[in-house]
Design a protein with these regions (language model features):
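A short glycine-rich, Lys/Arg-flanked "PGG" loop and its adjoining helix->strand segment in the class I
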Residues: 130-145
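Class I SAM-dependent methyltransferase SAM/SAH-binding core
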Residues: 49-106
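Acidic carboxylate diad motif detector
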Residues: 148-150
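A short acidic, Gly/Pro-enriched loop at the edge of an enzyme's catalytic core
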Residues: 105-117
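A short SAM/SAH-binding and catalytic strip from SAM-dependent methyltransferases
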Residues: 116-128
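Short, glycine-/aromatic-enriched active-site segment of Class I SAM-dependent methyltransferases
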Residues: 152-169
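Conserved alpha-helix/loop element of class I SAM-dependent methyltransferases that forms part
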Residues: 27-44
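N-terminal, positively charged/glycine-rich alpha-helical extensions of SAM-dependent methyltransferases
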Residues: 1-17
Length: 169
């Protein structure tokens, strides 16, 4: 758990990070957040949807680095939403980052509502990724962009052994 997350007093990242130049977990996590923001082309005119925001650490970074007009977060885990809202209040960002509880596969938003839809290392939790992408395209404005940093977990070891056995016996 601690090897894959940067949990410090000030930062609650839940991503694996981008380690090209980083030398600490916190720096790597922030680097991945910034990389995704750059690849998405975040800018001050954007209305951004962050799906599966965890503790919304990336939303704070995107707000400070790219200054989008608005960030709305959607997360299915009530305890994470509560903690993230409390943290945004502590940082004075409750009016700038709107965090909501809801599903990535049944988004409570009208069609063509957002300029950018972001998902930072959370899509592997969605049931299913295809349903998430369908919803993401539905809420995306024409000309908008979806930016996803994803993880593809390996199957359990016993599954790999079974496949190996089937292939070679």
């Amino acid at each position: 758990l601690l090897a894959t997350r940067a949990l410090t007093e000030d930062e609650l990242y839940l991503n694996l990070g981008y380690w090209r130049e980083a030398n600490t977990p916190e720096a790597a996590c922030r680097a991945l957040v910034c990389l995704l923001g750059r690849e998405a082309g975040l800018n001050p005119a954007d209305r951004v949807l962050d799906v599966g925001f965890g503790f919304a650490e990336q939303d704070r970074v995107w707000l400070s680095e790219f200054a989008p007009r608005e960030i709305v977060g959607l997360n299915i885990t009530a305890s994470q939403v509560a903690i993230a809202r409390e943290r945004m209040c502590q940082y004075g960002l409750e009016g700038r980052i709107d965090l909501r509880e809801g599903s990535a596969t049944a988004m409570p938003f009208a069609a063509e509502t957002f300029d950018k839809v972001m998902a930072l290392e959370c899509a592997f939790h969605f049931d299913t990724r295809a349903d998430f992408l369908h919803e993401a395209f539905r809420v995306l404005r024409p000309g908008g962009r979806i930016a996803v940093a994803d993880i593809l977990p390996e199957p359990p070891a016993e599954h790999r052994l079974t496949r190996f056995h089937q292939r070679w016996t």
